């Protein structure tokens, strides 16, 4: 129960009252969190809200933590030196790369959003992917990212059924999104020499947007 509360605390805006984060049940991420995060957005879209309103609601339900990771990593990618790039992740100031990444992903996602199911499956896809990828990643520093990697390494096969279902439902879209998301993750991973919480937040955002865009394939 403590582990599930940790998932809610870290991946949603829902207050779970967790004193210590425990990701031993990281495998449950694609099953527990997407309905809570994308469910309200999908319902809003079904009731007639615009894609802009629906996607903003989805982002708010995540607590904006992962969007912050996207912006931080985008800023870090603008710096060639690895140590300086890692330092940029800790800088609270926002650079041009981060601003562009946030605006671009939002614009592309909202322009491509067409159905409630699309939002739900995109969230399941991103959550299943991060568990699987984290299991084969190494942290470049202690922290939440390292804790998540430890949890994912022992449980990641349990997240594969969620990814398999998504692939069966939309094969071309999912495989295309998978290729795009993994390529973008590889760029950040190689540039920074590993992963941390920001890199995983970046992966969550770009993989969700990639799936939303490729949905139309």
Swiss-Prot record:
The keyword Transmembrane applies. Its EC number is 2.7.8.26. It is an enzyme of class 2 (transferase). It is a multi-pass membrane protein. The chain crosses the membrane at residues 6-26, 39-61, 95-115, 116-136, 162-182. GO terms for molecular function: adenosylcobinamide-GDP ribazoletransferase activity; cobalamin 5'-phosphate synthase activity. It is found in: Cell membrane. Its main location: membrane. The keyword Transmembrane applies. GO terms for cellular component: plasma membrane. Pfam families: CobS. It catalyses: alpha-ribazole + adenosylcob(III)inamide-GDP = adenosylcob(III)alamin + GMP + H(+); alpha-ribazole 5'-phosphate + adenosylcob(III)inamide-GDP = adenosylcob(III)alamin 5'-phosphate + GMP + H(+). Signal peptide: none annotated. Pathway: Cofactor biosynthesis; adenosylcobalamin biosynthesis; adenosylcobalamin from cob(II)yrinate a,c-diamide: step 7/7. Its cofactor is Mg(2+). Keywords: Cell membrane, Cobalamin biosynthesis, Magnesium, Membrane, Transferase, Transmembrane, Transmembrane helix. GO terms for biological process: cobalamin biosynthetic process. It comes from the Archaea. Belongs to the CobS family. Joins adenosylcobinamide-GDP and alpha-ribazole to generate adenosylcobalamin (Ado-cobalamin). Also synthesizes adenosylcobalamin 5'-phosphate from adenosylcobinamide-GDP and alpha-ribazole 5'-phosphate. HAMAP family: CobS (MF_00719). This is Adenosylcobinamide-GDP ribazoletransferase. It comes from Pyrobaculum calidifontis (strain DSM 21063 / JCM 11548 / VA1). The lineage of its organism: Archaea, Thermoproteota, Thermoprotei, Thermoproteales, Thermoproteaceae.
């Amino acid at each position: 129960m403590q582990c599930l509360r940790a998932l809610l605390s870290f991946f949603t805006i829902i207050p779970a009252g967790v004193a210590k984060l425990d990701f031993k049940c990281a495998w449950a991420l694609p099953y527990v969190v997407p309905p809570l995060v994308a469910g309200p957005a999908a319902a809003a879209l079904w009731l007639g809200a615009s894609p802009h309103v629906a996607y903003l609601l989805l982002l708010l339900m995540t607590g904006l933590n992962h969007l912050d990771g996207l912006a931080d990593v985008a800023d870090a990618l603008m710096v060639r030196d690895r140590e300086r790039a890692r330092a940029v992740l800790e800088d609270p100031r926002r650079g041009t790369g981060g601003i562009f990444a946030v605006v671009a992903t939002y614009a592309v996602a909202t322009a491509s959003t067409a159905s409630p199911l699309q939002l739900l499956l995109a969230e399941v896809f991103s959550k299943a992917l991060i568990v699987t990828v984290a299991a084969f990643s190494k942290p470049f520093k202690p922290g939440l990212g390292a804790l998540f990697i430890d949890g994912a390494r022992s449980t990641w096969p349990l997240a594969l059924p969620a990814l398999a279902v998504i692939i069966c439902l939309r094969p071309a879209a999912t495989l295309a999104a998978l290729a795009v998301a993994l390529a973008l993750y590889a760029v950040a991973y190689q540039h920074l020499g590993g992963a941390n919480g920001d890199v995983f937040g970046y992966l969550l955002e770009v993989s969700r947007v990639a799936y939303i865009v490729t949905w139309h394939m």
